Amino acid sequence: MRMNQQDTHKENLEFNKLQKKLRRNVGNAITEYNMIEESDVVMACISGGKDSFAMLDILLGLQKSAPINFKVIAVNLDQKQPGFPEHILPNYFESLGIPYYIVDKDTYSVVREKIPEGKTTCGLCSRLRRGTLYSFAEKIGATKIALGHHMDDMVETMFLNMFYGSRLKSMPPKLRSDDQRNVVIRPLTYCREKDLIAYAEYREYPIIPCNLCGSQENLQRQNIKAMLIDWDTQTPGRVESIFKSTQNISPSQLADRNIFDFENLPLDRTGKRAEYEFTEAEVSSSNINIDESMFIDVTNI
């Protein structure tokens, strides 16, 4: 019994530490990207996966202590996938005592009709889901749409675009839709997937499998995910470093002519030149007979 009590105490300490870390990361992301503002109505999109459950959990926790007032509404899109347990999310939302909506939209049939057998359906499914959620956000007056993508998702997406699309592009922490009618936020931007997995295990969320439709994660993303896991094992902190690089862009050190004017780089030698970091230099020649008078002291040039 004593060992059990010790184990429980240790587990509680680990959970509290992890919870504080995730809340701090989410709070920092919200603050730094101005994700949530006074009087915002945040539509938290809940799929039933670990990430969206954790996002909702943390948002509700921050809502109680935030210096601003904002509303959180949980929304699940029931896409009519076979075997989807329709009772789980309503029961969960009811247990939390929060406002929620279940949106019924049979995108599953549309995807099955359009995508050939054996091909991944995730791309079309995602687009149909996004369009439905955008429309519903306007209907309920939501000013922000919160999605559960985390740091690993963003880094994976960047490499997918680099390796298979020849684009240096990822997922932004905050995004305005093309028609400018909706703003999407990703509060888990600074959170690692491994922390969310551990958090979900502690919280014992009623996780709903994401592959009820029968579609498997595409091979390209699987390869990228495996690569990042290997890197993270060999060099802890590498994923964080890669993500931070997306926050420190130097357009003049890349090659995109659309974001930096490489064609017009005129010399400007007006004014006094700043001193270089050396005091003297010698210039020599490959000639066999070297004329020492050709050596140049550039100290005062």
From Swiss-Prot:
GO aspect biological process, one term: tRNA thio-modification
GO cellular component, one term: cytoplasm
Pfam families: ATP_bind_3
GO molecular function: 4 iron, 4 sulfur cluster binding; ATP binding; magnesium ion binding; sulfurtransferase activity; tRNA binding
Co-factor(s): Mg(2+); [4Fe-4S] cluster
Organism: Photobacterium profundum (strain SS9)
PANTHER family the record matches: AMINOTRAN_5 DOMAIN-CONTAINING PROTEIN, SULFURTRANSFERASE-RELATED
Principal subcellular localisation of the protein: cytoplasm
Enzymatic reactions: cytidine(32) in tRNA + S-sulfanyl-L-cysteinyl-[cysteine desulfurase] + AH2 + ATP = 2-thiocytidine(32) in tRNA + L-cysteinyl-[cysteine desulfurase] + A + AMP + diphosphate + H(+)
Record bears the keyword Plastid: no
Lineage: Bacteria, Pseudomonadati, Pseudomonadota, Gammaproteobacteria, Vibrionales
Protein name (record): tRNA-cytidine(32) 2-sulfurtransferase
Function: Catalyzes the ATP-dependent 2-thiolation of cytidine in position 32 of tRNA, to form 2-thiocytidine (s(2)C32). The sulfur atoms are provided by the cysteine/cysteine desulfurase (IscS) system.
EC numbers on record: 2.8.1.-
UniProt binding sites for [4Fe-4S] cluster: C122, C125, C213
Residue interval(s) of motif PP-loop motif: 47-52
The family this protein is said to belong to: Belongs to the TtcA family.
The protein's assembly and partners: Homodimer.
Keywords, sorted A to Z: 4Fe-4S, ATP-binding, Cytoplasm, Iron, Iron-sulfur, Magnesium, Metal-binding, Nucleotide-binding, RNA-binding, Transferase, tRNA processing, tRNA-binding
Cofactor note: Binds 1 [4Fe-4S] cluster per subunit. The cluster is chelated by three Cys residues, the fourth Fe has a free coordination site that may bind a sulfur atom transferred from the persulfide of IscS.
Taxonomy, superkingdom: Bacteria
Enzyme class of the recorded protein, top EC level: transferase
Compartments, as annotated in UniProt: Cytoplasm
